[in-house]
Amino acid sequence: MKKLTVIIVNYNVCHFLLQCIDSLDKALKDIEAEIVVVDNHSRDNSVAALHKHYPHVRVVENLHNVGFSKANNIAIRQTTGEYVLLLNPDTIVAENAISDVIDFLDAHPDSGALGVMMLNADGTLAPESRRGVPSPLISFYKLSGLCDMFPHNRRLGRYYLGYLPWDSPQKIEIVSGAFCMLRRSALDKVGLLDENFFMYGEDIDLSYRLLLGGYVNWYFPTQILHYKGESTHKSSFRYVHVFYNAMLIFFRKHYSHLGMLITLPIKMAIWVKALLALVTMVTTRMRWSLGFAVVRNIAMTGDFVFIGLKTMTDACRDISRKHGLNAIYLDKADPIYINKVLEKTKNKTTLVFDPQSISYREMLSVMRQMKNKKVNIGTYQYLTGSIITHSEIIQ
């Protein structure tokens, strides 16, 4: 039996997937582990790229998009790792992250699931790194905006557990599916992911069932980066439908015993939220089609700071000239010097790192120190000769 099985469900995000596996290979260096990618019928050459560049990765090819839950369950049933890590393809894992997490879980045998400190592309902390169970009352606080108004309040801010410290392990309730380390014996007891959830909500449901099964869910302060949404399209009608439908599925599954007087207002709030999201989406698209809004290539409107070896910066110079990018070139990731450079830039800036000379752990550390500036992360991908940003692949 292997110590760890890593499962990645992929759908049309080839560049992010290759980057994710590059970071994984470094993080798994001294761990007996296997990587399984379940591809939900991608059409962007993801499978061919995996076979070419990462032949050690096991690939399961689905004939159609079966959804996140079912795809993960397929891989879980075919593997035997003591721990199972569900990982989004649009993530970067620091070199120390997985070994630190496994050591912690080994020391806490009552743990069921564990999540980590997720950073957004701009280096800020992703609040969904720690969440509470969305009970009717907690859901009301979230949907009404009270959670956002009082994020550190123990009652009103419980959805994101904003009152907990970030720099130490904490008991939490809901672990994000973007990085969800699971104990296989716990899965054997409470069951796999509920396939009624096509996408979204399955992590909430599984985390809740682990709690009901007597396990403890943890937050651990090791870092990963989550581009958050590059593996989905959050501006689509389908996203709005699937996301809010998942909320209703969870609500019906776990709180149907409550009276209509309690459940109906929450259900109505969910429907109203979904309707408002759709109206906003349709209005925005109408403005674009009528010429009242300018559609810009977000990634190419700001400044770029390329940090790495000469091989990397030379390749990025060619790309910059091709696309007319405003570019600065550095040979080391010194936060103090980078801050001085950023003081001279007026636009949103993308820091593009060289993964051959700068560790992923160092990249994330630098981004944390840039968190109050208008900065996003980028990387240069040697395999495809591409610049990967949070919003665009530039070649």
Please identify what each model-predicted range represents.
Residues S23, D39-A48, H64:
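A conserved acidic beta->alpha catalytic loop
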Residues I8, V13-L28, C316:
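Short, well-formed alpha-helical segments that are part of the catalytic scaffolds
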Residues V133-I172:
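Short, flexible, basic/aromatic active-site loop/helix in glycosyltransferases
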Residues P165-D167, E173-Q223:
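A short, conserved alpha-helix in the catalytic core of glycosyltransferases
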Residues V84:
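Short aromatic/hydrophobic "clamp" motif used to bind/position activated sugar donors
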Residues E61-T79, D100:
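Glycine-rich, basic loop-to-helix element that forms the pyrophosphate-binding segment
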Residues I92-E128:
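Conserved donor NDP-sugar-binding/catalytic core segment of glycosyltransferases
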Residues Y208-T284:
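Active-site-adjacent helix/loop segment of glycosyltransferases
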